[in-house]
C-alpha cells in the first residue's frame, strides 16, 4: 500500500487521454444537516475544574456539540488553571467502542489560565485540542476550482463561488481533503481559500501559481489533498503502470470467493471438477503470480503458476488465473504469491477467515478454504429441506406413568429425584445456596416422566406443526436424565419404555411420514455402565466390567477391558475431565483399532450402528439415521467404517455430526452427510439480538446484514451442496440457552419475565423463524420453543414442554411458517442468491426455474424472496435484474400482500421487527429459452461481427461484452431481433469477449451463450529497420540496445505512440562460434546445466516517430560469451497475432546475430560451499558460504534438478550479499538436487558442490508464548485445546514461566494441523476471558513451518474468569501509622464494570485500572469493594472484596493535637461538601 506521493512524481507519469465520461461525485463527508452518530463527551482530569468529577464518562457537563460531517467540538465554559492535563473522548457514556486511540491518554499543558476547545471526528477517530491545533474558519475552507468542477458535479469551470468541493481536515493534521469519482479525461485545477480568488494556490503550492494538470486514464475515485501549512497540493491518483516498479498496489488486489468471477464454480467442488481461481491487480502491476495450496489429506503444499488473462473494460485492472482439479476428496487451503521486481506480496483470506474478499500482506497470510468432496456424496431426498424437531425425551410428554419410578439409583448409588409437578423447574445444583432451593444438589438425577409413548401420543401434534423429522436425544439405558452416559447400548432406558415401545413409535412415525434420528454417544460411556462398572453394580451378571477387572489385577478378564485405559493408580481419561464419562481409548490414533469395540458398534451383524436402524430385521420399525455426539473427538476412520456399516442397512442414511465450528473436513463424502449448524445459529442470533450477550457457549456481538450474509455465505461455500441443503439449522438445543431467553425472556427470572421482555423476545424469535424456514437446510425446532418455553443454561434449558400453558399465538405462527415451507418446494431445494444485505434488512432469493431444482429434480417453476428486518418499518427496494424478470407477480405468504417486479426491482413493505416470504403466483411462465451454443465472432478494423443460430421461443436477443472470459459482462445491446450483430463501439488493439442471451415473449432470459473472443485492430503493414548490434564486451552493466520500427496505416502515421501497440524484443543464445569454443570453459560451462536456446521476450518501449512509423527500443544484458540472436515483433491486437521485423526485401522475417566477447577479467570466483539442507516440510532451505573474486561478486544463481546429473534448471538469482535461499516450489517426498553458482561482474561462473534434499512431513516444534495480567496468581498457566495427547484438558500442557508475566511451552505437532486452544490455570474455572470479562472464542492456528521446522505463536491473556477484580494495594490487614489519614485503593477490573468502594461508585479508566482515596479513622477500617457488570447480570463478573486497614492510635501526648487536626479536617470536608 502506498502513502501519498509528491505532485512532481505524479506529473512524471501522467498520460493524456481524450475520452471523457460523466460521473457523479462521491464526497466522503456527511452533510452539514446530518444527525449525530453518537453522544461524545470529553473526559479527563480537568473535569473537576468544571464542577464535575474527573474521568466521569457519565458527565452531562462535558458533552461535545455535533457540528456535522462527523465533527464534534467542546469548549470549556471557564478557563482551566495553568498546569498539565490528560483526557480522552468516550462514546455513549461508555469506554466500550470509544472514539479514542486505546493506547493511552492525550495530554496538554497550559502555561496560564486558558479556555480550551476540544475537537473530535467520529469518522476518523481523530482527537485534538486548541493548544496544538487551529482549524481554518468555515468561510475560508479550501475548495477545488478548475475545469474539474463540472466533471465531478462541483460547480462551473473556474468559479470558486460555485464550488461544492469543500475540503476538510478529518484528522486534525492540517491536511484538508476531498474525495470524488473523476471521469477519464484531462483537467486543470487549483485550490482557493473560501469562495473567491483572493487566496489561491497552484502548482508546487505556490500562491497564485500555475494551474495543476491532472490527466486521468480511467474512471476512478481520487482524493485531493491540501496542506494548510506548506500549501502543497497533491492527489492519491496513480497513473497506469508501464513496467516493474518493485511495488504492488495492495488496495487494487482482490479475490472474492463469493463472486463466481473470482472463483468458479461457487462453493465446494466435486472430485474431478475444475475450479477456476482468479486474482485482480492494478493493470501492469505484477510480473508473476502463483497460487500456493495445502492439501489437508495428502499433507502437502504445492505452488502453481498463474497466467494473465486480460484487463478490465476500463483498463484499470488486470486479471490472473489458474485452473485446479483434484482426484481425491480433501480440503484445500490456498493463498496467492504475487511478485513485481523485488517486491513480493501475499493475498489470503480476511482475518476472520469467512471467505469473500481477502487481504494483502507482506508475509504469508491466512488461507482461503476450498472443499473438494466425493462426487458420489448425497443425502436422502427426504432430508433436503425437511423440518426437524428435537426432543429431550424425559421432558416432552408423559405417556405411560407406570414407568415413572423404575430406577432405584442414578449414578452409582446416588438417589433418584422424581418430580411430581410437571411444571417445576429442573433441579439446578448451581442454585443450591439460594433461598428456596428444594433439590438434592446432585447433577442430572431428576426425572419428570417423559417417555417414548408420550412422543407417540403427540405425533399428530408434530404432524400438524409440519414436522417431518424427529431427532431424539439419547434413549438408551443410562443413570442420568440426559443419557449421554450410556449404561447399555442394547436396551431402551426403562423410564422411557422398552423395545416394543420403540418399535411402535418408529412404525407410527413412519406411517405419518415422519423420519426419526437417534443420538449416538460413542466417544465415552458411563462409569456406571455394564462395560465399566466402577461401582460393582453388575458383578452378579457374571460378566466383569473393565474397572472391576482392573481392581482384580487383570483388565483382560473383562470382555470390555481393552475399551478403556486405566492407569495403575486407578485413574483414567474422562471426557473433558469428567470421571463419570470414561473415554473409549484409541490404538494407533483410532477407536476402530480397538477390535472388540469396533465389532460391537460397527462390524458385527447386529452391531449397534445397524441394529437400531433395523431391529430384528424390520427397517420400518427402526430409526432412519444417527446424530453423533462429539463427532470431532472420535477418530475419523471410526466414522468411515460407521458409514460403511449403516449403508448396508439404509444407504446414505443421515450421519449428523455434532460440531460447533467448521465441519467441512468431516463432510468430504466418506462418513458424515450433515452437521448441527451452530455457525448458522450464532450468525442469526448476532444479527437479530443486536447487542452483546454471553449465552454460556459463545459471546454474541451485534452485526449488520452484510456481515450476516458473509457468515452465512461462508457456510454455503464450505459445505458440499447436498450437505448444505441437509444441515441441521438450529436456533437452540439441549446444549444451549433457550432461544427465547437468548432473545431476552425468561419466565423464571424476575429480571427478564416482564410482558415487554416477552413481547420483544417473541418478535425476535418469529423473525429468526422466518429466516430459518426460508433458508436452505433442515431447520430444527428444539421442543417447546414454538410454544414459548424459556430457560437459561444447562440444566434450565431442559424444562418440560408447557402442555396446557402454551403460547398459542407463537404456536400458530410456527405452524404457519413451517407449513409455508412445506407447501413450497422452492423453499426446500430452490437455489439461493443474496438479493439485499444492508443495515437492518437481509433478503435472499430462492428459485426453481426451467423446471429443475438445485439438484436437477423436476418441479414446477417457482420463485421466493425472503426478507427480514430487525429495525424500524420501511420500504425496501430490492434489485432483481440478475434474479428474475420484470412482470413476475408475488404474494407474501405471511401477510397476503401482493407485489410485482418492475424496472428490475421489487419494492417490499416490511414492518418493524418483521419479515416477508414472497412466493411467485402460480401459472406464470418462468422458463427461459435454451442458451445459444454456436456464437461466432469475426474481428475487423474498428468492429466485431457476431452471428448465431435461431433459438426456439426467442423473440429477441441481448448482447453482452467483456474483456475477460468468465465475467465482468456489460449489456451493450438489447431487443436485437436479428441473429447477427455488429459492434462498432470498440477500441482497436483491445481484446473483447462476447456472449448472447435469448429472450422470450414474457421477458425470460436464457443463460449466457458460449463465449467468443475478438481482437479488432489496425492491420500492421510492416516491421523492420532493426539495428545491427556490433561485437559486444560481456559485463553486468553493459546492456545491448535494439531498435526497430513498425507501420500500421491509421495508427502509426499519427503523432505520438500508436494506441495499444505492443512491441517485444526476442533474444537467445546460440553458442556455436569459435569464440564460444575458446571461452566456453571459463564463461559458460557449469556441469549439469543445460544452456537454454529458447527465445526470451521482453517488452520494448516507444521512443519516437520515424516518418509514418513508430520506433521502439528494448535492452538486455547477455550473460554468456558466444553468438546471440535477436529479433523484434509487434502486435496491434494484444498479442493475438504478431508481425516480425523484416529483412531488406520487406517480406522475410529477419533475425540478426552478434558476438559477445570476454572482458579483461577472465578469472573465476572461488566456489561457494553449499551446506546439506535439513529435512523440512514443503520447503528446502539452502545456505552457502560466500565466494571471493578478483574484481567483485555480482550474485549467485540457484539451480535445481530431479537428477544428480542434471539437467539443472536455474530457479532464482540473488545478490552478492545473500547466502541463503528458500525453495517452496517442492512436493513432500520428492527428491531434489541443488547447486549454487557464483557469478562475478564479467559473468565468470563457479559452481558449488551438489546437495540432495527430500522435503517431507515432519513434526513442527510449535512454541506458544503468552503474556498474562500482572495480577495473575502464581499457580501456573496451562494451554488447553484439541491437542492430540491432551484433548481440552485445562490441567495438562503446563507452561514454563519465562518472565514475571510470561509463560512458554513448546509442543511437537504435525504440519497442517488445525489447533483450537485457550489458556487456563489448571481448571475451566480459571480460564482466560476477554477484556470486558466476556467469554472469548477459541484461539485458532494452523501449524506451518516458519523455518527450520519451527513455529512461534505469541498471545496475550486479557483477564481470568476467577479474577474479575484484583486489588494491588493495600493488602488485607494492612497497618498504617497514626499520621496516615487516608489511603489509596489501587485495583484492576474488566472494562465497563461498575465499581463501588464503601458504596460510593466511580468509573475506572479504560484499561481497567482504578484508584480511589479512602479516608481512615483510628482503629480498624473496613473497606468494602464491589464490582458488577454495567449491563446484563453475570454472576461470574460480580464479586465482593473486604479489606481491613488499621490506623494506629497516636501516642498520648500527641492525642490532643491530632484529635484537633482531625476535627479540623472533618469540618473542612463537611464545608466543601456543603458548598
UniProtKB/Swiss-Prot annotation:
The record marks 735 as: Transition state stabilizer. Residues 928-1019, 1164-1257 form the Fibronectin type-III domain. PROSITE patterns: CBM20 (PS51166), FN3 (PS50853). It catalyses: Endohydrolysis of (1->4)-alpha-D-glucosidic linkages in polysaccharides containing three or more (1->4)-alpha-linked D-glucose units; Hydrolysis of (1->6)-alpha-D-glucosidic linkages in pullulan, amylopectin and glycogen, and in the alpha- and beta-limit dextrins of amylopectin and glycogen. The keyword Hydrolase applies. Keywords: Calcium, Carbohydrate metabolism, Glycosidase, Hydrolase, Metal-binding, Repeat, Signal. Its cofactor is Ca(2+). Residues 1-31 form the signal peptide. The active site is at 629 (nucleophile), 658 (proton donor). Pfam families: Alpha-amylase, Alpha-amylase_N, CBM_20, X25_BaPul_like. Ca(2+) 2 binds at residues 398, 400, 403-404, 449, 451. Residues 1255-1362 form the CBM20 domain. Its EC number is 3.2.1.1, 3.2.1.41. The keyword Metal-binding applies. One of its GO terms (biological process) is carbohydrate metabolic process. Belongs to the glycosyl hydrolase 13 family. This is Amylopullulanase. It comes from Thermoanaerobacter thermohydrosulfuricus (Clostridium thermohydrosulfuricum).
